[in-house]
Amino acid sequence: MNKINEKRKSLINIGSATVYIEIFVLSAILLGASLFFLKDYDAYRAIFLIRIILIAVAALSLIKWAKLKRAEALLSYDSYDGGIGLEVANKLMDRAHIDDGDKVLDVGAGSGLLSIAIAGRFKGSKVVMFDYVNNDDEIIAAREGRLTEEEIRNVSRRSGKFLPLPFENGEFDVVVSGFSLHTDKDNRDKSVLIREALRPLKKGGRFALMDILNEAHGFKDIDNMLYELENNVVSEISTEYMFRDLEEAEEFKKAGIRDARLIYGVK
């Protein structure tokens, strides 16, 4: 997985230089063209040519900017790959109390970091990576690259919508999710997704769900929802903020993650 991120870093570094080179070259062409064509009787040609070149500069710069932003976003998404990601994955696994041989559902697997971490540690377990149908091609490519690179065999893939999940009641021993539910595109109130994520969990099964649990990310009345879950759905539930100290909080904020909370317990 480090190779994947190194490639993205290279794209960002090389791409940034390329943008400046392209702008410089096209600007030089623009200047040269204006000097060559700028004559009274041909002023309209100069203006027309300048407009065409400006449009080309803008279009090429915009395309390159979009590619760079995408690479930066994926790198940030998988900065999860090292410090933050490894710590988050380990904490989720620890709180979920996974046993070797468990059937585990990862809701919103994304690029597969959490699923692959679980499958690598618990080689006797079966891990189902579930994510959006028609998810981003680059995220899918990153996921497949990880599976190949890590030589993971005990993982299967499913896709669909989060509501409802395409699984039977009580199908899994463990349900986990890492920073995924808030990205759901189909439901304004993301709180209902937590309840749905617990539906395929067996009675007595363990869960650990981490997300950005605030109203800005679609989670409404989260405390009331947790109270309702504790009294009607699960037998044990705990919650904790991910920030142990100010330094860690800053690291999460750099990765675009605020109000990160972990919900875990037993159904």
Briefly describe each language-model feature range.
Residues 117-163:
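Class I SAM-dependent methyltransferase SAM/SAH-binding core
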Residues 191-203:
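A short glycine-rich, Lys/Arg-flanked "PGG" loop and its adjoining helix->strand segment in the class I
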Residues 112-116:
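Glycine-rich SAM-binding Motif I of class I
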Residues 204-211:
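Conserved beta-strand signature within the Rossmann-like core of class I S-adenosyl-L-methionine
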Residues 245-267:
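Core SAM-dependent methyltransferase catalytic element
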Residues 66-90:
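Class I SAM-dependent methyltransferase Rossmann-like catalytic core
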Residues 101-110:
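Conserved class I S-adenosyl-L-methionine
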Residues 163-175:
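A short acidic, Gly/Pro-enriched loop at the edge of an enzyme's catalytic core
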